[in-house]
Amino acid sequence: MRMTMEEMKNEAETTSMVSMPLYAVMYPVFNELEHVNLSAAQTLRAAFIKAEKENPGLTQDIITKILEKKSVEVNFTESLLRMAADDVEEYMVERPEPEFQELNEKARALKQILSKIPDEINDRVRFLQTIKDIASAIKELLDTVNNVFKKYQYQNRRALEHQKKEFVKYSKSFSDTLKTYFKDGKALNVFISANRLIHQTNLILQTFKTVA
């Protein structure tokens, strides 16, 4: 049975989403290791990237198995969200023009606010302010994306438009999750949705980096 285009896109999104622990958790480890043994760090990074590409979700499996073996009880989704604000070199747009650097900055700002959710969610007043800050950061990122669209022409504009639509879709989904949270109080669903939005933010940068 052949998959529809939408199903293929959804599968691709799920596949890339499960690879989030590679750059959120392992990349900082590799960066630290580079100070000790550059060659070993580069070899290990390349091996993890190759393995993750061939077996999406492998990094997450390895991390959870280590935590289980050490009997460490941790909310992996929450921890991932806390760690996901860091810049990922592979996603940063390298073009020097101000619009592209602003794109990096606005994406970074949104990710940093989202990563604070676990610390703010139990304080209603602070969390409501965080929600307002997230809404502003989303708007600022989209405005910056539109500014880049206006100023620069792209052959592969469809890919950029698609990624922008995906980002908007996940932004709305995040908003819906928040509404549900205020009814059922399930913070985990907010963490999951925030991680997805961070992932979409990285994909916007990655798409611009690829076609720019």
Curated annotation (Swiss-Prot):
Pfam families: PDC10_C, PDCD10_N
Keywords: Angiogenesis, Apoptosis, Cell membrane, Cytoplasm, Golgi apparatus, Membrane
Record InterPro entries: PDC10_dimerisation_sf, PDCD10, PDCD10_N
Location, primary (coarse class): cytoplasm
GO BP terms, alphabetized: angiogenesis; apoptotic process
Transmembrane segments: none
Subcellular location(s) of the protein: Cytoplasm; Golgi apparatus membrane; Cell membrane
PANTHER family (alphabetical): PROGRAMMED CELL DEATH PROTEIN 10, TF-1 CELL APOPTOSIS RELATED PROTEIN-15
Function: Promotes cell proliferation. Modulates apoptotic pathways. Increases mitogen-activated protein kinase activity. Important for cell migration, and for normal structure and assembly of the Golgi complex. Important for KDR/VEGFR2 signaling. Required for normal cardiovascular development. Required for normal angiogenesis, vasculogenesis and hematopoiesis during embryonic development. Promotes cell proliferation. Modulates apoptotic pathways. Increases mitogen-activated protein kinase activity and STK26 activity.
Family in the record: Belongs to the PDCD10 family.
UniProt protein name: Programmed cell death protein 10
Gene it is expressed from: pdcd10
